[in-house]
Amino acid sequence: YISKSTRKWLNKSQHTITINHAFDAVITACAAIPRSPIVHEDGSIVQNGTWITQSMINAYKDLHKAKLAHSIEVWNEANQLVGGLYGVGINGVFCGESMFHIEPNTSKLAFIALVRHMEQYNGIFIDCQMQNPYLASMGVIEVPRYEYLQKLHLATDMRMPSDMWQPQGVVL
């Protein structure tokens, strides 16, 4: 789902979208996002700052080298990285891990590009992990566990074209 205001913004946007051109920069930008601490009822802090630690970054870089982790990048007219997302793509499923934006709407643009890319290659679904108002505004829905497991089974059994995650540009 693309709202009327987002569609209007997209039509005016001069951004360039790429896949797997700057994975390291995207995960680093995602890790730099200030996040509020998550506090349990007993007062203990579960997360203070980012969950994307250096060891996580290193692990995802290894997954990227193995062609399992991928990034969507959004570049402005000055060729600066201003938004993006990364996650793990296995056959017909993409599990999003994190996204960032420096300019307004650019993480939304990265997500829309991911959806279109998955549609182009007949991917089955994108696992956003946690529902939130931002994702809901883009049409993301929660599915019951049994339905999720069915889709996951179908998606991981699919064989996708070898060029799906090659570095490339995306046209919306």
Regions found by a protein language model. Give the residues of each.
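N-acyltransferase acceptor-side catalytic subdomain
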Residues: 1-172
